[in-house]
Amino acid sequence: YHHPIGEVFFSFIPTLLRKKNDKIIFDLDDNTEYKLNEEDKKLKLTKEQNINLSKLNKVEKFSPSLIYGVTGSGKTEIYLQLAEKFILQNKSILILVPEINLIPQLEKRFKDRFNGDIGVYHSRQTPNQRLKVWLRSKFGGIRIVIGTRSSVMMPLKNLGAIIIDEEHDQSYKQAEGFKFSGRDLAIKRSQIENIPVFLGSATPSLQTLKLVKEKKFKKFDLLRRVDGKKPPKLIPLDISDSPLLGGIAIQTMSIIEATINKGEQVLIFLNRRGFAPLYECDNCGWVAKCSSCESNLVFHKSKNRLICHKCESVYGVNKTCPDCHSNEINTLGTGTERVEEVLRSSFKKVPIIRMDYDSTRLKGSI
């Protein structure tokens, strides 16, 4: 990656190990034994799962394997049974996920299956938490670790395989500091250590599909849902001529209202946190930008602050334009806070929960 070797090492070493520290105390006998919970394993595999699992279990060395499974096809059960195989061989396994908020559900599934400690490693943990998982992994205290891209170089003892869930996700790429792709590093590490690497996705990246076509990756299909149900119906809406209410089309609001009136729930996905992605002057066109990285600042109404989502710098809100001194400053665009505000105003008696980085960053908030 054309980076200084020290910066590369520091990217994957816990903060507390980056300087000499004689106060670190670690119990080398703090090992966990993994016992299989047979009650959790009673689930009967589908024909597709059985066929693919038998083939995947034969992969012993480096041979990138794409587990292409539609949503609900049982990829997680495949992960669990692959992990069981390596645990029984007294090996470790690393499971990578693209986002921190995907960890709790996967961690629960592994805890339900294995009676033993499941290591979790990500950037929102305290330095002590990360250090403990890192050291226990290195000395064999824990042999199952679930983590984000920062865990890709975890020094697991006797590593048997790496699983990359949602391999297509762009969150595996780090854009600041030492720039790298956790997905690509995991594949390269598997090649160097000559161990299996399994990539799971319902929507594989074009890069992966190209490698499958070139027969450099093997592909295992799970095309049917475990429950036998058909995929949900997708209805595209043409909102080009529709008035918007806080970024939501009138047709969409009508569908939300009809769904609520039937006593059902609604999930709304929006990939922008904050209130508005632009804070600008209507008079001269000035746009609030970060002085550190030149990125556009995002207005967060709940904090009354302008925040850079790239470097996390925080600024006060300008009452007047710094260029033309006009008071005509407005927000442009829609973020999760604006959508929440509109929905609360439209459906006053309906409980509404906003889940994004700002509302779920504290421990226990999810």
Regions found by a protein language model. Give the residues of each.
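Accessory, non-ATPase domains that flank or precede helicase/AAA+ motor cores in DNA-metabolism machines
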Residues: Y1-S201, T208, K213-K229, I260-N261
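Conserved phosphate/pyrophosphate-binding and hydrolysis machinery centered on Walker-type P-loop NTPases
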Residues: K42-K47, E60, G72-T76, L96, ...
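Conserved interdomain hinge at the start of the Helicase C-terminal
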Residues: Q81-F86, S242-N271
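Conserved RecA-like helicase motor-core motifs
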Residues: S92-L94, F114-Q125, K289-S292, V298, ...
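Conserved helicase ATPase core of P-loop NTP-dependent helicases/translocases
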Residues: T126-K138, P351-I366
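SF2 helicase motor core recognition
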Residues: G147-L159, A276, L343, K363-I366
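Interdomain hinge/linker at the junction between the two RecA-like core domains of SF2 helicases
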Residues: Q207-I248, S295, K301-K303
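Cys/His-rich short segments
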Residues: T252, N261-S346
